[in-house]
Every structure is written in C-alpha cells, then in structure tokens.
C-alpha cells in the first residue's frame, strides 16, 4: 500500500487566557491562530484521498471566533451566560491546542474510515511563536 503525507494550513480567530500564568497572558486576549498539519496514511482506494482537506478545515474551525478557557477557570461560568466557551483540561496554550487538534483529527481519520494519522502539527499564536507536536 502506498503511503502519502498531506499538508493543510487553517487559520482561525479565538480568545483565550492562561489561568496559571503570571504575566499579561493571564488576561483574556485574542489571537489570529494558524494551524499547520501533516497527516500520513494510505489513500482511499476508490477516491485516492488520504483525508479530504475540507474535513481538516472543519475540525480546526470549531475554534473560530470562540473563547477557549481552562475548565477550572472561574471565568467560564460568567462568560457562558453570554457566549459559549470551549474548555480544556489545562491552560489552553498553543502546546495543548496542538495536542487537542491532533487528537481530533486522528478521530476524524477513523470516522472517515481511512488508515491515516497526524504526524506533525504546528499551532501558531503569533507570526513568530508556535508549538509543534511531532508523533
């Protein structure tokens, strides 16, 4: 079976804060996030696609224009009265978002019935700062 590595870049806007950080990132603030993802696997024998790029974008875009907070953050309850909040098990750093998105994309591969997985993902929170998860 042939193995192919595909790449997709997706951007989204979202706010977050780091509950356990001492410094300005403890305040609620927003970013123009960029996600770069590499997925490796065997293409579907019928359509020759590893995973549809639109499916990758859809998984990442669930964060677009959202507020992302640590599930232990006391701000969650106050903000949820006005706007939905995506919560994470820990502070929503670029490092943690890389793991969450990679896991979500791996689940999407399984859901699509393709033998593929994320091998590398970068989550950029600014033009000069990113976290890269390599598996």
Segments from the language model and where they lie:
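Charge-rich, low-complexity N-terminal segments
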Residues: 1-135
């Amino acid at each position: 079976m042939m193995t192919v590595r595909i790449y997709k870049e997706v951007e989204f806007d979202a706010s977050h804060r780091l509950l356990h950080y001492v410094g300005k990132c403890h305040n609620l603030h927003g970013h123009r996030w960029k996600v770069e993802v590499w997925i490796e696997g065997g293409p579907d024998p019928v359509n020759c696609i590893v995973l549809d790029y639109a499916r990758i974008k859809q998984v990442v875009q669930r964060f677009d224009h959202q507020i992302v907070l640590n599930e232990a953050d006391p701000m969650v309850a106050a903000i949820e009265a006005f706007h939905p909040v995506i919560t994470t098990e820990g502070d929503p750093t670029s490092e943690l978002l890389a793991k969450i998105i990679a896991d979500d994309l791996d689940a999407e591969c399984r859901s699509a019935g393709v033998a593929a997985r994320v091998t590398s993902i970068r989550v950029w929170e600014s033009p000069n700062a990113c976290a890269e998860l390599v598996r």
